[in-house]
Regions:
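Sec-dependent N-terminal signal peptides
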Residues: 4-13
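Surface-exposed, glycine-biased beta-strand/turn segments
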Residues: 17-91, 97-102, 116-126, 131-132, ...
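Contiguous beta-strand segments within globular domains
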Residues: 201-248, 351-362, 448-459, 591-598, ...
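Proteolytic processing hotspots in large secreted/extracellular or virion-associated proteins
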Residues: 444-446, 531-539, 568-618
């Protein structure tokens, strides 16, 4: 009874606290981003409050308390006020244009004292006490900000970020979260989802009552996990938000839960482990995991000890996923999963005339009766053609007979996927009526290696279909080899089972054998596959030995395989000079825990060239980005430190930054009241401009001043303390890029 009373008191306390917190502007209560949004290498720790796209909106204290700290930086929150509240919380108001006048004066004095734009000043509880609703600053666009807004964080007494929509504000919201797609991820060695060892993505469909449903019964074998593409919305805005809580139930039992109430800063680095990172890197979108791998740390948003990794008994199981926003609006996803086991079939022709053909689908391994089937047609070159409709279908004892138009099989290969009586999918079977002379000697295999978090696949694609073909993988060295059979998953595509990462140990070559009848052809591929893992250093080299990686004890979450490909087709390099091949670090879709080192050797004739750097390709920004590099001219190698598996190359940057859109303009004449700010637009097309003070110098009448720099907009600005005197004035400005290319300008103007 005492425990129940305590819970009620806590709930009432939270509610009263929420009602007692003021919105920090006099504008509408709208925000563009909310707490917990995943930014790959961190979480968004607050609310991005809209200011109507304007700078200079009054920012109000949301509670009673005192200003405990001010800070200014080119990056992060830009200009920010920190408040300690009487309720014991810490509030951060970021991206401000300016502080209140008295704080602004202190800030300017601190800049002069430090001779720097960057200021970090603490205050005592007696210095600047404020009441709820007091003015504390004016909104802006400083720091890492894409548009004018206020970044507001609501933290605990220990400076741990809390969800403001749960702990501070109660905002009206009558819009339920949206569920879009479901991913099913095979985890264990032999796991299958709808007869495939690869991750599968399915759309979710909403009924008239608002409940979402799986498109069909899912068939699973072995251990697997769910991941979901879902978002929250709010009336009156088109923005997409992070939901507050999500629950996974299997047959009424809660198996997993995420709840975005608080996230300590030290846990931000684990953001990659919360999403299905490989799918995001493959441009499939952001899916949040409804499971946690053993090697991934449990963090504050994990509110249950269950891992969410599922191994279901044979039979039918009910799945419910609840998605809840901060206001309590709930979206429900329902589906059925059939726990099953691997099964195969064969197809035999039982009837044919000029218009139709009937095939008998006969269960083999697994032996359960077949109750339905899905059939796709493919061209001889392996391209999917269409899903075929049956003229008729019927169960005949354990078999399943399908009748198809004769025209649908002409010069086509049929991929037949049976469905057994439990709803489980049967491994694909390929049937054809093609008359061809192409044999194993006539086709060329293309090899693809996929290394997942718990195993790797070898997959080949043939450039033409070959009848009754087997494919075999051989991992060889100079003395011996290990062979692995490959399953046909499409007419021209074959894949191994998920293999342990250690199979590549001592491997020097990858041989693919294609067999059809008595004919056989073997193709050799050269990959330097290296087994890596946590707790040890490893060295990986490209085939030409000119590109290398050094992984560190803290680089990886789990055992894996790493290699380096030299690529022939790559994103265009529009500026600068490419001075090495482009190398792709693999696997490109692996979530990395820590940093690693890369190196690229260059030709001897480039030893005296300046401004060489390692660049990586950022697929989201669609541009080559400089990675801080060291040049060892004696060893003819550039080295850098990276955190993601990207394409890298050496580029030489000889172009200076661009200076444009300067105010006041050269030769300009201005009234003093019209001249309260210096503004300069800069840009650099290759190595970029570092967000630190060594990148700039700005003098007004031969006196150093300390401007702000907005790294997204690439704008330098300085607010004048007081009107300039009448007469002539001079601005001297210099900007440097990361390669120390430099541009300077001098502006003369007159105040009248």
């Amino acid at each position: 009874m005492i425990r129940n009373i305590t819970i009620i008191i806590l709930l009432v306390s939270t509610s009263l606290s929420s009602q007692d917190v003021l919105w920090p502007t006099r504008l509408g209560k709208f925000y563009s981003s909310n707490f917990g949004e995943n930014r790959d290498d961190h979480f968004h720790m607050g609310l991005d409050i809209k200011t109507g796209g304007k700078i200079g909106i009054e920012v109000l204290a949301i509670e009673d308390g005192y200003i405990s700290r001010i800070r200014s930086d080119y990056n992060g929150y830009g200009k920010a006020v920190y408040q300690r509240t009487n309720s014991g919380h810490e509030v951060v108001y970021g991206h401000l244009e300016s502080f209140i006048p008295v704080i602004e004066k202190i800030w300017k004095l601190q800049q002069a004292k430090r001779q720097s734009y960057n200021v970090d000043t603490q205050f005592s509880p007696r210095d600047f006490q404020i009441k709820k609703g007091d003015l504390i600053g004016f909104s802006g666009n400083t720091g890492n900000s894409f548009a004018p807004h206020i970044h507001l964080e609501y933290r605990s007494s220990k400076s741990e970020p809390l969800n403001p929509l749960i702990m501070a504000f109660e905002l009206e919201d009558n819009t339920r979260p949206i569920a879009k797609k479901l991913a099913v991820i095979p985890i264990s060695q032999q796991a299958l989802v709808n007869a495939s060892p690869l991750p599968q993505i399915y759309p979710l469909f909403r009924d008239k009552s608002g409940i979402y449903h799986f498109a069909d019964t899912l068939s699973v074998f072995g251990e697997f996990g769910f991941a979901i593409q879902a978002m929250d919305k709010r009336q009156g805005t088109n923005n997409i938000y992070q939901f507050h809580r999500i629950e996974l139930f299997i047959d009424g039992q809660k198996e997993f839960e995420l709840e975005y109430n608080k996230i300590p800063f030290k846990q931000g680095k684990f953001a990659k482990t919360i999403i299905q990172y490989d799918l995001e890197r493959q441009n499939e979108g952001e899916f949040q995991k409804l499971y946690r791998l053993p090697e991934h740390k449990k963090i504050s948003i994990h509110t249950t000890d269950h891992s969410g990794i599922l191994g279901l008994a044979p039979g039918v199981h009910n799945v419910i996923i609840n998605i809840i926003d901060a206001f309590g609006n709930k979206t429900v996803v329902k589906g059925v999963v059939a726990g099953t086991f691997p099964m195969t079939l064969e197809a035999e022709e039982v009837y044919r005339d000029k218009k139709m053909i009937t095939l008998a689908l006969i269960p083999r391994r697994g032996g359960l009766p077949i109750r339905d089937a899905i059939v796709y047609s493919f061209t001889p070159y392996g391209f999917a053609d269409q899903k075929l409709d049956f003229i008729k279908s019927e169960k005949v004892k354990k078999d399943f007979h399908i009748t198809l138009p004769i025209s649908s099989i002409q010069d086509r290969i049929l991929q037949i996927i049976g469905i057994n009586q439990l709803g489980g999918m049967v491994n694909p079977y390929h049937w054809d009526d093609i008359k061809t002379k192409i044999t194993a000697l006539d086709v060329n295999p293309d090899l693809k290696i996929s290394s997942t978090e718990h195993g790797l696949f070898f997959q080949i694609t043939l450039d033409h279909f070959v009848k009754k073909t087997d494919a075999i993988l051989k991992l060889a060295n100079d003395n011996t080899f290990m062979s692995y059979s490959m399953s046909q998953i499409q007419p021209c595509v074959y894949i191994t089972d998920k293999l342990s990462h250690d199979v590549v140990r001592n491997m020097k070559y990858i041989d693919i054998e294609i067999k059809s009848g008595d004919l056989s052809r073997q193709t050799r591929f050269h990959y330097n596959l290296k087994e890596v893992g946590p707790g040890r250093e490893s060295y990986i080299f490209s085939n030409d030995r000119n590109c290398s990686m050094k992984t560190l004890p803290g680089t990886f979450y789990q055992e894996n395989i790493v290699w380096i490909n030299e690529v022939k087709e790559f994103a265009p390099i529009k500026k600068g000079f490419k001075l090495s091949p482009v190398y792709q670090l693999q696997p490109y879709d692996l979530a990395i825990k820590g940093k690693f080192q890369v190196g690229i050797r260059y030709d001897k004739e480039l030893a005296e060239h300046s401004n060489l750097g390692i660049y990586y390709y950022n697929s989201k920004k669609e541009k080559w980005i400089y990675s801080a590099s060291e040049n060892n001219r004696r060893k003819l190698i550039l080295t850098s430190v990276m955190e993601t598996m990207d394409a890298i190359t050496i580029i030489q940057d000889l172009d200076s930054p661009i200076i444009n859109n300067i105010f006041p303009g050269n030769g300009g004449r201005y009234y003093a009241q019209d001249l309260n700010k210096i503004s300069i637009q800069v840009d650099d097309y290759l190595s970029g401009i570092e967000s630190n003070e060594s990148s700039f110098s700005l003098l007004l009448n031969e006196k150093n001043i300390y401007p702000s720099f907005q790294p997204i907009k690439k704008t330098i600005s300085y607010n004048l303390d007081s009107p300039l005197n009448k007469g002539s004035h001079k601005i001297e400005f210099t900007v440097r890029d990361r390669m120390k290319n430099e541009s300077s300008t001098t502006i003369y103007f007159t105040v009248i």
